[in-house]
Amino acid sequence: MRKLLQISDMHFGTEQLDVMAALLALSQENKPDVLVVSGDITQRATAEQFSRARAFCDSLRVAQMISLPGNHDIPLFNLFSRVMSPYAAYQKAFGHALEPDLITPSLCLATVNTTRWWRHKNGEVSKAQIDRVCEQLSRATSQQLRVVVVHQPVHVLRPQDEHDRLRGWEPAVRAWAAAGADVVMGGHIHLPYVCELSDTVSGLKRRLWCVQAGTAVSSRIRREAPNSVNLLEFPDDANNLRCCVERWDYQKAGGRFELADSSVLNVQRI
């Protein structure tokens, strides 16, 4: 089995040292093969916050890391930088690519930069981005788990979170499902959940899963959701059509992340 650790919404500048230490221990225990950082790495997109965030990600010692920016990762108050070079600090710490992909014999992973400098917090996906991901998915083999990573969610469970849903989510979900995607990962709202999109999007003819992550190490937690991360386990040969998403929550009393929930994803091959 291969393991993918998804961490999101770290918001460095609001990080908690005890939670960071617990996440480091979790990573050492589980030894994931891939680390996915799904946006909002910092609180205010400063070089110092990005530097600390990168050092922490490196300390997890995961062989392959994929990251993408969130809305907090572009300057808020420096309007010149926000317009002219919104990703400069992010790219200095995490690399030039804003939409990196990862291709291995068992994984086809595509990322989408859903941030826009002219939007304060809402994200959007363009037709060009949708098409680019579809092209990537079209080259995937039946042995590869096919994952798309965004920042803002393509599905929300509660009416009060609807305004945070990704703009353009519906054509994206329909196109990516038709192109063969298995999982869409996201963050942004600090609320972890797993759901089958074919149960909520009418006319979707193929099984597609939404996997949302909470906030990994930030003090900006929801009252109903502690710090959490997701661990996705998938076979070396995805023809074995079962994957597992484990949600690990931070328990303050024990000072460690503990398994809180587990969902089996039945992956469809047509």
Predicted region positions:
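N-terminal active-site segment of His-dependent metallophosphoesterases
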Residues: 1-59, 77-80, 97, 132, ...
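Active-site environment of divalent metal-dependent phosphoester hydrolases
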Residues: 13-15, 43-47, 71-82, 117-121, ...
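Extended active-site neighborhood of metal-dependent phosphoesterases/phosphodiesterases
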Residues: 51-132, 140, 174-175, 204
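Short acidic, glycine-rich surface-loop motifs adjacent to enzyme active sites
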Residues: 142-159
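Conserved beta-sheet core of the metallophosphoesterase superfamily
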Residues: 162-238
